[in-house]
């Protein structure tokens, strides 16, 4: 993947709420739960993305980007899967943090609060 002509090493990035990656502007990912219906998380993700885009439009922002301000305490992503193809490539996945909003959760109710009801603007999300 490239941003402004520069190649991006996804494995050096940290997931933000399981929806965006640190320091990559206007880029969203949709991945589901490995322990429940895949679409539960994708539904929350799509509604969060729509809410974020509407917020940006209402404020005149063209860029939204999570920034790792040094508090993510990066670790290898814990997807909860033990398939060989996952384990062989896990070092190429984005990292996750030890706590929110960098922690990848496998819990619908925690994600419901964090994606549907939490404030969009915080000290981790950059807008311009």
Where are these regions (language model features)?
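Glycine-rich beta-alpha-beta "Rossmann" dinucleotide-binding loop(s) and their flanking helix/strand
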Residues: 1-10
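Generic signal for short, ordered secondary-structure residues
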Residues: 6, 24-25
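Alpha-helical scaffolding within the catalytic cores
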Residues: 10-16
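C-terminal, flexible cofactor-proximal segment of oxidoreductases
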Residues: 15, 26-128
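Short glycine/proline-enriched loop/turn "hinge" motifs that connect secondary-structure elements
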Residues: 17-23
């Amino acid at each position: 993947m490239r941003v402004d002509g520069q190649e991006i090493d996804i494995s050096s990035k940290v997931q933000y709420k399981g929806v965006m990656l640190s320091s990559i502007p206007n880029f969203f990912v949709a991945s589901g739960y490995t322990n429940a219906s895949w679409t539960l998380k994708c539904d929350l993700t799509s509604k969060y993305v729509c809410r974020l885009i509407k917020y940006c439009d209402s404020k005149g922002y063209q860029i939204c980007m999570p920034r790792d301000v040094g508090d993510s305490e990066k670790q290898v992503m814990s997807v909860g899967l033990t398939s060989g193809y996952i384990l062989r490539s896990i070092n190429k996945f984005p990292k996750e943090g030890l706590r929110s909003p960098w922690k990848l959760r496998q819990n619908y109710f925690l994600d419901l609060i964090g994606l549907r009801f939490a404030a969009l603007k915080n000290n981790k999300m950059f807008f311009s």
